[in-house]
Amino acid sequence: MKVKGSLKSHRNRDKNCKVVKRGGRIYIINEIKPRCKTRQGS
């Protein structure tokens, strides 16, 4: 999983990317391409 300061560019990488909030963190998940997984923050 990648950790980024901003998810704006990662959100638009693939049409199957979804933005999800879990436990106060923001994640981008993609069930078709798991390598697109990203988390915001340190």
Swiss-Prot record:
Swiss-Prot/TrEMBL keywords: Ribonucleoprotein, Ribosomal protein
GO biological process: one example: translation
Keyword field contains Ribonucleoprotein: yes
InterPro entries: Ribosomal_bL36, Ribosomal_bL36_sp, Ribosomal_L36_bact
Taxonomy, superkingdom: Bacteria
GO-annotated cellular components: ribonucleoprotein complex; ribosome
Listed GO MF terms: structural constituent of ribosome
Signal sequence, renumbered to the chain: none
Family: Belongs to the bacterial ribosomal protein bL36 family.
PANTHER family per UniProt: 50S RIBOSOMAL PROTEIN L36 2, LARGE RIBOSOMAL SUBUNIT PROTEIN BL36B
Matches recorded under HAMAP family: Ribosomal_bL36 (MF_00251)
Name of protein: Large ribosomal subunit protein bL36
Source organism of the structure: Wolbachia sp. subsp. Brugia malayi (strain TRS)
